[in-house]
């Protein structure tokens, strides 16, 4: 089992920010990544639909023999975390609690903002996670169009700036000093988000904290990859267009994406792979 890959799942390419952090902290591990781009974005979908798509992708990862699951998607974490932990015999790591932990440590005023998809914000998953953090005030804002910009590779420009100013106005009015990027796509928008919020506001991504949790679970369960094994290899699967996934995904992860293949469940619809 120690030689098995870590399974990472997201609705698209955003979870590659988490994959990048995992590889930085655990360079000796191999990854198997599934991006459900055929059904992205998850944010506008009903929770039950998100749960169904997410569990189908997680089923594929478990069937492929991963030793640990990372749900690198806030919407999916909110929709199916409890189900996943009951359904599978491997450990499950998610992104909401790690981001909350980092934000609580970072805030000076106790006023924290969280931005995310409609599914994440309406689930109130962050409110639940912050319930035990005394002295904090949470302001939540849905930013439904951000994921589409990122999936299209657009991370700057006048249109995006105007949209960001409109989305973040409630956080500015609430005078938050910390903002959780409550979607793993959003770290690619830190330039425009940071510009709008100003230098005094800390932006919190769940990626590094989730990677730390992944490290802790591997250590706890004795699942570190045997260093005597051959060098680790990584596989990237998508339910959508592999060429588009590879093009945008390399901006998140870098040269580790040498090829993207169609996920098994999507193979009847498309049977192709793209290399570099």
Curated annotation (Swiss-Prot):
PROSITE patterns: ASP_GLU_RACEMASE_1 (PS00923), ASP_GLU_RACEMASE_2 (PS00924). Pathway: Cell wall biogenesis; peptidoglycan biosynthesis. Keywords: Cell shape, Cell wall biogenesis/degradation, Isomerase, Peptidoglycan synthesis. GO terms for biological process: cell wall organization; peptidoglycan biosynthetic process; regulation of cell shape. It is an enzyme of class 5 (isomerase). It catalyses: L-glutamate = D-glutamate. The keyword Cell wall biogenesis/degradation applies. It comes from the Bacteria. The active site is at 73 (proton donor/acceptor), 183 (proton donor/acceptor). Belongs to the aspartate/glutamate racemases family. HAMAP family: Glu_racemase. This is Glutamate racemase.
């Amino acid at each position: 089992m120690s030689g098995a890959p870590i399974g990472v799942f997201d609705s698209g390419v955003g979870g590659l920010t988490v994959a990048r952090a995992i590889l930085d902290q655990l360079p000796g591990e191999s990854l198997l990544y599934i991006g459900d781009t055929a059904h992205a974005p998850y944010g506008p979908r009903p929770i039950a639909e998100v749960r169904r798509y997410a569990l189908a992708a997680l089923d594929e990862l478990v069937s492929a023999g991963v030793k640990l699951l990372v749900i690198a998607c806030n919407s999916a974490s909110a929709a199916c975390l409890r189900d996943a932990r009951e359904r599978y015999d491997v450990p499950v790591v998610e992104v909401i609690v790690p981001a909350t932990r980092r934000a609580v440590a970072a805030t000076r005023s106790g006023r924290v903002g969280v931005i995310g998809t409609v599914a994440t914000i309406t689930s109130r998953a962050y409110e639940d996670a912050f319930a035990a953090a005394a002295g904090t005030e949470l302001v939540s804002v849905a930013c439904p169009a951000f994921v589409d910009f990122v999936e299209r590779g657009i991370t700057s420009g006048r249109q995006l700036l105007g949209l960001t100013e409109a989305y973040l106005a409630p956080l500015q009015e609430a005078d938050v000093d910390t903002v959780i990027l409550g979607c793993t796509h959003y770290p690619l928008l830190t330039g425009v988000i940071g510009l709008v919020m100003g230098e005094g506001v800390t932006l919190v991504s769940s990626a590094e904290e989730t990677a730390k949790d992944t490290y802790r679970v591997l250590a706890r369960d004795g699942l570190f990859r045997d260093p005597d094994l051959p060098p680790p290899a990584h596989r990237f699967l998508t339910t959508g267009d592999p060429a588009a996934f590879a093009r945008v995904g390399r901006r998140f992860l870098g040269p580790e994406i040498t090829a993207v293949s169609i996920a098994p469940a999507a193979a009847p619809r498309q049977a192709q792979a793209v290399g570099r």
